[in-house]
C-alpha cells in the first residue's frame, strides 16, 4: 500500500519512461524513479538475456513490453539483483512468476528477499527534500520471494551474463553488488553511487545528470559506502548505469567519480544522522542491530507538512 502511495504522490512525469542504450547489448529503462537494465543482444533467444533489478511497483507491464520489443517471446535466463530495496523489487514477484526464472542476489542480501529480515529503518533527517522526508513510508520488508531466490556464485561470475563479474559494493545495504564487464568498461552500479540527487523530488523529476553518493536516507554504513565508491572509481569505467539517474560515460563521468571517491566525506556523507554516528550491523541472518534514531523536531514538522501536501496532490491526481 505504501509503495502504491509513493507512486501516486509523484507527479505524472515520473510515470514516464526513457530507454537509453548503455552498450549494444545493454538497455537502461527508467521505471518511474528507478532504472532496470535488459542485458542481451537484441533478438536474443529464449533464456539468453537477463534482467537486472525489477523496478518500482506498477511497472510490470512496461518492463515486459520493452522485453517483448527487444527480445520477442524469449524469456530471460534469470533476474539478478543489485540489492533488494523496495524500489528495486517492486515488480520482482510478478516478473519472476510470469517468466519462471530464478532470482540471484548476494548472500548477505538473501535474508531480505526470503522473509527472514527487514531492512534497517531509513533516516529521514539526512539529505533534505521530499524523497528523504517521505522515507519512513517506504516498505522495508521483510520481502519473501521464496525458493526462486538463490545466491550469486562465489566465483564472481554472473548467471546468464558471460563476460561479466559481480563486485560486492556494500554500504547502501549489506549485500549490495555492482556488475562489471572489463572487456568494454561497462559498469552497472546499482545504488553504490547514483547520477541524480535522489533525496530531492525536484532532482528526481528533472533527472539532472550529476554524480552523487548513494541515497542518504537508505544508506546504513557510510565507511563501507566510501570503500565501495573508491573500488568502482578504481575500475575507470567507460560507462556507468546507476539505479537512479541517467547513464553517464566518458572522461567527464570518470572525473566526477574520481572526485566523489576523493572527497566522499564532504560530498556524500551527511554532517549528522542515524547511520553517520554508527552503522547498522548485519550478517547472513539479516539486520542484527541499528543505532538509535536522531530526533530533529523542525525536520519532523516539515516532513509532516510535506507528507500532507503530497497526499493532497496524490488525491487530486487520482480524481483526474
Task: Please give the residue ranges for each predicted region.
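Residue-level marker for buried hydrophobic side chains located in beta-strands
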Residues: 50-52, 80, 103, 186-188, ...
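Short, flexible loop segments at boundaries between secondary-structure elements
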Residues: 264-286
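Metallo-beta-lactamase
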Residues: 8-9, 56-57, 109-170, 174-251
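Hydrophobic alpha-helical topogenic segments used for membrane insertion/localization
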Residues: 292-319
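C-terminal/domain-terminus segments
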Residues: 122-134, 163, 239-272
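Active-site metal-binding motif and surrounding structural segment of the metallo-beta-lactamase
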Residues: 60-105
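Conserved beta-strand hairpin/beta-sheet module of binuclear metal-dependent hydrolase folds
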Residues: 12-71, 179-190, 195
Amino acid at each position: 500500500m505504501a509503495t502504491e502511495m509513493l507512486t501516486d504522490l509523484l507527479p505524472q512525469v515520473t510515470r514516464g519512461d526513457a530507454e537509453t542504450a548503455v552498450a549494444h547489448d545493454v538497455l537502461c529503462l527508467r521505471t518511474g524513479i528507478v532504472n532496470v537494465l535488459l542485458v542481451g543482444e537484441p533478438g536474443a533467444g529464449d533464456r539468453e538475456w537477463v534482467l537486472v533489478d525489477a523496478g518500482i511497483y506498477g511497472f510490470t507491464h512496461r518492463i515486459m513490453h520493452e522485453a517483448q520489443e527487444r527480445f520477442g517471446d524469449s524469456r530471460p535466463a534469470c533476474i539478478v539483483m543489485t540489492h533488494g530495496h523496495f524500489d528495486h523489487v517492486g515488480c520482482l514477484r510478478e516478473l519472476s512468476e510470469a517468466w519462471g526464472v530464478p532470482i540471484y542476489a548476494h548472500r548477505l542480501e538473501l535474508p531480505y528477499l526470503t522473509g527472514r529480515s527487514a531492512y534497517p529503518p531509513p533516516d529521514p533527517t539526512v539529505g533534505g527534500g521530499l524523497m528523504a522526508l517521505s522515507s519512513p513510508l517506504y516498505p522495508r520488508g521483510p520481502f519473501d520471494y521464496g525458493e526462486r531466490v538463490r545466491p550469486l556464485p562465489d566465483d564472481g561470475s554472473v548467471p546468464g551474463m558471460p563476460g561479466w563479474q559481480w563486485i560486492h559494493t556494500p554500504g547502501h545495504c549489506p549485500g549490495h553488488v555492482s556488475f562489471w564487464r572489463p572487456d568494454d568498461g561497462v559498469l552497472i552500479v546499482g545504488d553504490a553511487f547514483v547520477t541524480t540527487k535522489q533525496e530531492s523530488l525536484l532532482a528526481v523529476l528533472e533527472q539532472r545528470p550529476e554524480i552523487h553518493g548513494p541515497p542518504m536516507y537508505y544508506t546504513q554504513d557510510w565507511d563501507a559506502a566510501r570503500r565501495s565508491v573508491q573500488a568502482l572509481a578504481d575500475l575507470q569505467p567507460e560507462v556507468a548505469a546507476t539505479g537512479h539517474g541517467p547513464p553517464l560515460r566518458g572522461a567527464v563521468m570518470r572525473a566526477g567519480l574520481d572526485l566523489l571517491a576523493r572527497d566522499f566525506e564532504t560530498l556524500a556523507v551527511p554532517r549528522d544522522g542515524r547511520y553517520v554516528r554508527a552503522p547498522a550491523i548485519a550478517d547472513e541472518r539479516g539486520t542484527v542491530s541499528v543505532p538509535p534514531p536522531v530526533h530533529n523536531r523542525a525536520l519532523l514538522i516539515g516532513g509532516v507538512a510535506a507528507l500532507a501536501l503530497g497526499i493532497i496532490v496524490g488525491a487530486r491526481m487520482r480524481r483526474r
